[in-house]
Structure formats: C-alpha cells, structure tokens
Amino acid sequence: MQQGWLSNWLVKHDVVHRSLGFDHRGVETLQIKAGDWDSIAVILYVYGYNYLRSQCAYDVAPGGSLASVYHLTRIQYGIDNPEEVCIKVFAQKDNPRIPSVFWVWRSADFQERESYDMVGISYDNHPRLKRILMPESWIGWPLRKDYITPNFYEIQDAH
C-alpha cells in the first residue's frame, strides 16, 4: 500500500501508526493505537494540524471493534487547498476507551460527547463526558450494530 508524505514523516520520526491508504478525495488515512492517540494528537497539532474539521464514530462489525474518526486540517493564511488527514482510532467493544483530544482541539467537545452517546466510546479525560442527545436514563448505544430497540416509544404531543 502506498504511503503518503505524512505517514513517511511519522515513520522517519519513529511514530507508531499504520497507513490505510487514501480516500476518494486523496486524503491520507492513518490508524493510530488508542494508547498512543493523545501524544500523537499533540504532535499533529504542533506540526500544523490546527483544525478538527469533524469527529465521528461507528461500529465496525457485530462483535468487532468501534472506531473513532478524526478529520484534521492544516489551516494556513494564503493557502487555498489546506492539507488534510483522516485519523482512525479503534477500541474493543467490551471496554471502548480512547483518550479525549478536547485539550488539543476544543471543537472535540460536543463531537466526542455525541460519539459517546450514540456508540458508547468513553473518551478519557474529557471534562464533560455525558449524554448529549439521549436522556441520561437511556440504556444502550443506539448506533451500535448489536443495539436492541426498546419495544416502547414515548408518544409526544406536537402541540
């Protein structure tokens, strides 16, 4: 598999990762181990990836792992096509824990909370990790493939 310039730079500096190739727009995708993510996030920020464009999470496969995905952009004045990278961090479904990058990119606040609420990934050291869309009393993680839909629905008055 062809590695991009960022992957080559990380290899040169002994940063452990795995290249996953490029997406349809030519954005390099890298896999980072959960235990290394907080320190590598700081390296990427210092290197110039100063904008967290988006963060999301998904269930990879029933009985498999969960993934937290970060789309980072290197914003610079006078540059029309900023550099982008996609980072994927995987966690086991039985104890899904990933370090929070709230302290690196503040925009991760609500995005990591939504991923926690919908998929159940716990983001370590997040200052306000609690449900954001579902009630605190909700049981389960609605976007997991093994989620069982409750057999009740609250009827709400639209008026």
Curated annotation (Swiss-Prot):
Subunit organization: NDH is composed of at least 16 different subunits, 5 of which are encoded in the nucleus.
Species whose genome carries this gene: Zea mays
Superkingdom of origin organism: Eukaryota
Expression sites by tissue: Leaves.
Protein name listed in UniProt: NAD(P)H-quinone oxidoreductase subunit J, chloroplastic
Family: Belongs to the complex I 30 kDa subunit family.
Reactions it catalyzes: a plastoquinone + NADH + (n+1) H(+)(in) = a plastoquinol + NAD(+) + n H(+)(out); a plastoquinone + NADPH + (n+1) H(+)(in) = a plastoquinol + NADP(+) + n H(+)(out)
Keywords, ordered alphabetically: Chloroplast, Membrane, NAD, NADP, Plastid, Plastoquinone, Quinone, Thylakoid, Translocase, Transport
PROSITE patterns given in the database record: COMPLEX1_30K
Gene3D superfamilies xref list: NADH:ubiquinone oxidoreductase, 30kDa subunit
Cited InterPro entries: NADH_DH_suC, NADH_quin_OxRdtase_su_C/D-like, NADH_UbQ_OxRdtase_30kDa_su, NADH_UbQ_OxRdtase_CS
